[in-house]
């Protein structure tokens, strides 16, 4: 577990206005005029000041009252680390850091804990430890439905603020949720393959073991199946559950590609979140099969560029994490309570020609 304090985190790279004034040889009065968009400052000076503010990471303190009264707003983030989706923690971390940079000077503090996706009891222990330290506002990304129910029951009894990040809990609809509509994302994947496979064919759907009972992944699969029913030309092979790692995914696909022609897949809808492994197998066997999956990470960028992966359905996890922090912070600091509980992130499609924008 680690503490991340906005005001501490940036000390090494931020400068005060007085320090910036000395550095660029422009008075603080002039810098204040630029900050407040006052007249009487030349365009050249305005540009010099703006460049310096950006270079030295200056952030205006928009809540001086909080600073003067030494007010702090602590939010606890307890999320998972996953081998099959190891980019998740990295992207969420980027969003948390962005929120600290924006709200740290206004008193925001984040307490961060990450647990192994296969050891969900660690999440319960982390939440309990944070509660003992007085944290009453939480952002939670979970792996075990059973464990998160225990956590939510306790936190709700204690009137804690809660945002569920990336995965919702139907039994507790009164909490905030920031993430995608999984069912709709599955429908979108089916629509993509319908367009990529105009002649029809069979679709292979691999699913890793850890997602076998994941309600969101099953909802995504359900959306895919329901949309596919509208296309008589496409047939989904029985989902291939039980894949526990890279080797199993690789072997399952290799075996399927060696089957008789009437059993080979003509398209792949990936639910292993290891598109890198699937793309490598297709390249090694020199097979061009329409391949659709979710999320963008560095290991698959090349396979999108060469069209081994035809399309990705992308969600901006970093922006979701930032949004979750902002919602809680604005409620704690300004009393801004949102009536809307479900905050769905947009789904974007990434293909070869627009990859450069992501």
Please give the residue ranges for each predicted region:
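N-terminal helix-turn-helix DNA-binding module of bacterial transcription factors
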Residues: 1-71
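Amphipathic helical "hinge" segments at domain boundaries
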Residues: 60-122
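Short, solvent-exposed amphipathic alpha-helices that sit
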Residues: 87-104, 185-189, 215-235, 277-278, ...
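Short beta-strand elements in bilobed, periplasmic/extracellular small-molecule ligand-binding domains
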Residues: 100-119, 204, 225-247, 263-265
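Hydrophobic alpha-helical segments within soluble ligand-binding/sensing domains
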Residues: 177-204, 249-251, 300, 315-333
